[in-house]
A protein has these predicted regions:
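Acidic (Asp/Glu)-rich catalytic clusters
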Residues: 34-41, 81-99, 127-136, 204-210, ...
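Glycoside hydrolase catalytic-domain groove-lining segments
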Residues: 74-90, 94-97, 220-271
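Aromatic-lined carbohydrate-recognition surfaces of secreted/lumenal glycan-active proteins
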Residues: 170-199, 253-267, 315-325
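Substrate-binding cleft of secreted/luminal carbohydrate-active enzymes
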Residues: 12-37, 50-51, 139, 255-367
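Structural preference for beta-strand elements that scaffold enzyme active sites
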Residues: 21, 43-47, 95-101, 138-142, ...
């Protein structure tokens, strides 16, 4: 297995001052709703998800959107979380760039990370290169995203994760996939610490500076939210976990992306909030509260934009998830994965207008 090499191209750095990117996702239905509504800023990139180990499987081709011979197909596969096709995401909307969440989890693929490291899935990596050659803009490849999340089986073997990540990068670079930037994304999720009853050192998953163009994390809660369920473990706040990523990024001169951002447990259409999870605040979907738009804004959007402004030196991209989570089987009743709500901006004119103004200020007015 190849390790760090001295001949790799340099990674991006904050000093390169990349433009500030708004990314929208995370499935084709969500993107179509956002784009058709003209409610909000035009994104610089769109989000898609790919199941790496199924890339050559005829049932769904891993959501890649091309078949085994590299030809685009009309199939939009749905894993109960909205229709996906990375090819369509990159070509249907006139937005040239794409952020891809590349799943390497062993939840449905036990033992396959070690096989990836051994070279058993080099054909799947080649198929990624085939797709990327068809994409006119940048590909932000989030390899094994949320590596520290307890829900992602297999990543707990840090060496397997690192070697798998490196093999994918080395292979794509050897195939001259020049439009790819590599994203190392932690979850920064307090609920992971609740599950684990401890806080891991995320640096244990770091594949090395030569393999990372961006660092990233997810943002779903209020920055200073705390659990209302009694727990013996003293939990950090979402802000503290995000700060941990930013500290690493500054130390390693990497730009940062909020790779998944959504107002968890808020419903922008119905103007409500409810419990997310029994391990955090109570039975999922219960304790519903009616809110004003101002309360919704202050409950999630304002803290996120404040965090972006406070860290302008290092955060250069944010990917908003514009989805009706509650209508998707993976996230809807009976809420086995928690209550997520409805984060579609186009269903709430006031929130959409304020979001548009804040994105413009973050991108253009505050430097």
């Amino acid at each position: 297995m190849a390790g760090c090499r001295n001949d790799l191209p340099p990674a991006a750095t904050p000093g390169d001052a990349p433009e500030r990117l708004l990314i929208i996702g995370q499935d084709l239905g969500a993107i179509r709703g956002y784009m058709d509504s003209n409610c909000c800023p035009r994104p610089a990139a769109l989000t898609a998800y790919v199941d790496f180990f199924d890339i050559l499987t005829e049932d769904d081709f891993g959501g890649l959107g091309i078949n085994a011979t590299g030809e685009p197909i009309d199939l939009e596969f749905d894993w109960d979380a909205g229709p996906v096709s990375a090819y369509k995401t990159a070509t249907e909307f006139g937005v040239d760039s794409i952020a891809i969440g590349l799943s390497l989890t062993e939840n449905e693929h036990p033992g396959k990370l070690a096989r990836l490291v051994a070279g058993d899935f080099d054909d799947e990596i080649h198929q990624l290169a085939v797709l990327f050659a068809k994409i006119p803009g940048q590909v932000y490849l989030r390899i094994g995203y949320e590596f520290d999340g307890a829900w992602n089986k297999g990543y707990e073997n840090q060496q397997n994760y690192i070697q798998a990540y490196r093999r994918i990068v080395d292979s794509l670079r050897s195939q001259r996939a020049a439009n790819v930037q590599y994203v190392w994304q932690g979850s920064a999720a307090v609920v992971d610490d609740v599950i684990d009853k401890q806080h891991e050192d995320i640096y244990g998953w770091y594949p090395g500076d030569d393999y990372v163009d961006w660092m990233a994390f997810s943002w779903f809660m209020h920055a200073d939210e705390q659990t209302s369920v009694e727990d013996s473990y003293s939990l950090p706040t979402p802000r503290q976990l995000a700060d941990e990523i930013l500290k690493l990024a500054r130390a390693h001169a990497k730009p940062v992306m909020i790779a998944e951002a959504s107002p968890q447990a808020f419903d922008l259409l119905r103007r409500t909030s409810a419990n997310h999870s029994p391990i955090w605040d109570g039975p999922s979907g219960e304790n519903e509260v009616s809110l004003s738009n101002q309360q919704i804004w202050e409950g999630w959007f304002a803290p996120m934009f404040d965090y972006l402004d406070s860290n302008r030196d290092v955060i250069y991209a944010v990917a908003y998830i514009n989805a009706n989570w509650d209508a998707q089987a993976m996230w809807g009743r009976p809420y086995e994965n928690g209550y997520w709500g409805d984060s579609r901006l186009e269903v709430n004119d006031e929130i959409a207008a304020r979001f548009t103004a804040e994105v413009a200020a973050w991108q253009f007015e505050r430097d």
